[in-house]
């Protein structure tokens, strides 16, 4: 039973291949340790949010009620690791501390935010949670949607940039979609988290979305690893049309084949999928 480096050395020796090995610098080792620590903390948070959704009164009454209203079935909620963060300034912090997680990493991942006078608060409190996975399935960040009407709070909060989370390089749903994108040789690109989950549930699994940002060249490049065909389905309102135009300007110069689905004004992909199923595409 070989480790990966040992297997490489074994194969190289068997076939007389010269294998050049370099020693990792101390800086690279520390960087890798930090990344691993952030992945571990994000994994803890994902499990905490999921457990809160399924096993707390507030999670069931508020978080699960919202997902059920959207028509999300339990299997799709579990598949995307959806969760809920209770309306508390420090519930996640207390749980993390009780389990021995380093506060520094909670802050670096953006799960906890340091405010005035050194006070620390749970960043996603009172929100349903959409974990963001990288292509290998590791949780790199989160999106959180507020459910109560509060004009002072943004509708969505997203994890800040970190050593493991670079918004311009990642797409929501890519881990669950990558195989289907390859199989169908086509990728559906929508605007938001709920669009991805809703259409995935409707049977369109080759679907992704930017993570709270405008589409970037690096995200287009990520899709192109799996297919050269994109179908764009952005919201039918004025902002959605503007985003569509910008996305077209981003995609076509990359030499990718592009189709655009025009939704009726006031509809997003999630709304339209719930009314019409996946057949509209």
Predicted regions span which residues?
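Non-catalytic accessory segments of DNA primases and related replication-initiation nucleases
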Residues: 1-104, 108, 113, 127
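Residue-level signature of catalytic and energy-coupling elements of molecular machines
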Residues: 67, 199, 269
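Arginine/glycine-rich "motif VI" loop of SF2 helicases in the C-terminal RecA-like domain
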Residues: 222, 249-256
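A polyampholytic, Gly/Pro-enriched intrinsically disordered region
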Residues: 101, 228-236, 276-281
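Structured, non-catalytic alpha/beta "coupling" segments that mediate domain-domain communication
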Residues: 2-15, 127-146, 271, 281
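Acidic, metal-coordinating catalytic cores used for nucleic-acid/nucleotide bond scission
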Residues: 194, 215, 235-244, 262, ...
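Phosphate-handling DNA/RNA-contact segment within nucleic-acid enzymes
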Residues: 30-45, 86-226, 230, 243-244
